[in-house]
C-alpha cells in the first residue's frame, strides 16, 4: 500500500511539473526516444573513429587545444566546411582577428555564407555567442580563441594592472548560460584554446590551458592536438604529421589517439588518412611501394595513391564507408537495412548495401602508373 501511495505521489508530482514547465521537462529515462548521436565530421576518418561516434557530437561544448601551429584552426575549419556541406549554418567568432578567408576557402569553407564576428572584447564576444546560440538557427559556432577573450576591464586598464581571475569568471558565467541552450538547439560550440606553463611545477606536466577550469568541466570532448613530424618532398617541407589525443569524451571511451597529415595550403589529407587506415584494417594492401584495393592498383607510393583517391572521390567514400562499418562508427541512418518489412522490403533487399567497387576507375591508376 505504501509503495502504491509513493508511486501515486510521484506520478502527481511529474504531472504537476509537466503542467508548470512544459512537456518533456521531466520524464523517465526509458521513455526517451533512443536516437543516435548526431555528429559533425572532423575531416579526418582516423579522428572520427577515435571520437567513437563518427565526429564531433551535436549540442555539446568541444575544446581543441595545443601548441602554436599545431593545426587547431585547420581542424576546426574542416568541421566548419563539413557542417556547411550538410546544409548547416555556421558562425565564426574571430577574437584573434586572424582568420584567413583564402585559406578557409581552400579547405572547403563557404565564406560567402559563413557568419563572422570580430569582437572588441571578451564580454562582447560571449554575448554574441549567447545570442546566436539562443536563436536556434546555428549548427556550429567556433570561438577562436579563449586566450583572446580579453575582459573589458583589462583592455580599458593600464598596462601592467593586475586582473586576476577576470577571464576565468567571464568564461564560467558564459558557459553556465549557453550550455543548456546548446543542447536544446543542437548547436555545437568549439572553443579553440592555447597552452600556458605553470611556474614551479616539479612533478607532472606544467602545461595548462587558459580561461580557468570551467571549460574543462563543461566540455564534452577535449582534443589535444600536436605536431609530431614534418613531412618533406625532397628537402622542401610540405606539411605536418599530426597526432590528436581525445583527453576527455562524454559520448564514448576517452584517451584514444588519431594521426593524420596536414598539408600546407590544403589542410587535412583525408585521402592519406584513408590509405593509412585502409592498410591497418586490411582493405588496402601495400606490397613494396604499391598500394592496391581489391586487387586493383591505386598507385606507386603513398603520394600517387593519395592523388588517385582525390581524383576519384566515389572510391574514397567507398573505402571510408567500409572502415567505419567495420569499426561500428558513423553509420548513417538513411542507409537501408536488411530488416525492413512491407511492400518496399524486396526493393530494399535487392539494392546493394555497399556501392560496387569502382573497377573501371581503378584501372586508370594502372594506366597512369604505366606512363610513369
UniProtKB/Swiss-Prot annotation:
- SMART domains named in the record: AAA
Q: Which GO terms describe its biological process?
A: DNA recombination; DNA repair; SOS response
Q: Which CDD domains match?
A: RecA
Q: One Pfam family this chain carries? A: RecA
Fetch the PANTHER family from UniProt.
MITOCHONDRIAL DNA REPAIR PROTEIN RECA HOMOLOG-RELATED, RECA
The family classification in the record reads: Belongs to the RecA family.
| Protein name per the record | Protein RecA
Amino acid at each position: 500500500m505504501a509503495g502504491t501511495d509513493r508511486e501515486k505521489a510521484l506520478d502527481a508530482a511529474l504531472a504537476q511539473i509537466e503542467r508548470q514547465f512544459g512537456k518533456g521537462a521531466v520524464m523517465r529515462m526509458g521513455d526517451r526516444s533512443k536516437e543516435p548521436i548526431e555528429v559533425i565530421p572532423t575531416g579526418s576518418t582516423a579522428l572520427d573513429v577515435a571520437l567513437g561516434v563518427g565526429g564531433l557530437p551535436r549540442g555539446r561544448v568541444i575544446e581543441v587545444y595545443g601548441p602554436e601551429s599545431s593545426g587547431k584552426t585547420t581542424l576546426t575549419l574542416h568541421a566548419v566546411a563539413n557542417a556547411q556541406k550538410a546544409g548547416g549554418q555556421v558562425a565564426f567568432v574571430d577574437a584573434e582577428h586572424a582568420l584567413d578567408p583564402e585559406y578557409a576557402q581552400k579547405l572547403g569553407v563557404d565564406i560567402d555564407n559563413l557568419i563572422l564576428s570580430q569582437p572588441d572584447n571578451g564580454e562582447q564576444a560571449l554575448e554574441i555567442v549567447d545570442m546566436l546560440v539562443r536563436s536556434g538557427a546555428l549548427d556550429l559556432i567556433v570561438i577562436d580563441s579563449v586566450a583572446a577573450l580579453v575582459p573589458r576591464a583589462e583592455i580599458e586598464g593600464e598596462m601592467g594592472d593586475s586582473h586576476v581571475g577576470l577571464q576565468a569568471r567571464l568564461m564560467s558565467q558564459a558557459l553556465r548560460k549557453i550550455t543548456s541552450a546548446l543542447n536544446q538547439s543542437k548547436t555545437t560550440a568549439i572553443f579553440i584554446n592555447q597552452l600556458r606553463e605553470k611556474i614551479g611545477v616539479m612533478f607532472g606536466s606544467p602545461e595548462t590551458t587558459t580561461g580557468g577550469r570551467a571549460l574543462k568541466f563543461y566540455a564534452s570532448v577535449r582534443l589535444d592536438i600536436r605536431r609530431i613530424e614534418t613531412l618533406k618532398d625532397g628537402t622542401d617541407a610540405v606539411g605536418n604529421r599530426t597526432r590528436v589525443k581525445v583527453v576527455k569524451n562524454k559520448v564514448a571511451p576517452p584517451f584514444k589517439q588519431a594521426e593524420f597529415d596536414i598539408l600546407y595550403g590544403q589542410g587535412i589529407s583525408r585521402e592519406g588518412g584513408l590509405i593509412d587506415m585502409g592498410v591497418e584494417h586490411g582493405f588496402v594492401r601495400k606490397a613494396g611501394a604499391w598500394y592496391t584495393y581489391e586487387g586493383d592498383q591505386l598507385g606507386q607510393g603513398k603520394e600517387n595513391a593519395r592523388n588517385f583517391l582525390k581524383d576519384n572521390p566515389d572510391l574514397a567514400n567507398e573505402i571510408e564507408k567500409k572502415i567505419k562499418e567495420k569499426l561500428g562508427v558513423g553509420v548513417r541512418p538513411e542507409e537501408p537495412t536488411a530488416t525492413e518489412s512491407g511492400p518496399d522490403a524486396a526493393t530494399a533487399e535487392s539494392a546493394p548495401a555497399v556501392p560496387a567497387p569502382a573497377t573501371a576507375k581503378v584501372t586508370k591508376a594502372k594506366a597512369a602508373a604505366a606512363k610513369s
